[in-house]
Amino acid sequence: YNGFYEPFQTTTSADFEVNGDNILNYENYNFVGIEFNQNVPTIDASEMTELTMDIFIPDPFPFGSNIDIRLVDAGSDGSIGGGDDSTVSYTISTSLTSSPIMVQAQWLEVNIDITGLANRDNLGQIIFASDNPQRPSGFYVDNIYLRR
């Protein structure tokens, strides 16, 4: 996989390790993705119902901040952008209606229902994006997995 898929963005990567656990560390955040469809097979998650990950935001961020998370299935052609992709999106924010609500310096477990994806047998990307100028400057991601 490529944990730092990087076109059209300012985000930098400063990953680190804690007790043998690799933590993705995204800095100067606006857009970044994890890509697992180049030089490796896509993931068949047709039996899975949820994408789970932990997110930690170390620095203060303005009210109204958000992180949009998108899971992309490459479709039957196995190619992102091939015309038959499907995407499910999920947003965490400072809004009281967000679940979980973004907080500083605390690990947040994010559970994303993926049953709405038209296809789940060629997963190829996880995208973290925010067009909102009110966004965290960076965040950590750990424990990314699919489950039923």
Can you say where each PLM-predicted feature lies in the sequence?
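Beta-rich carbohydrate-recognition modules and glycan-binding surfaces
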Residues: 1-148
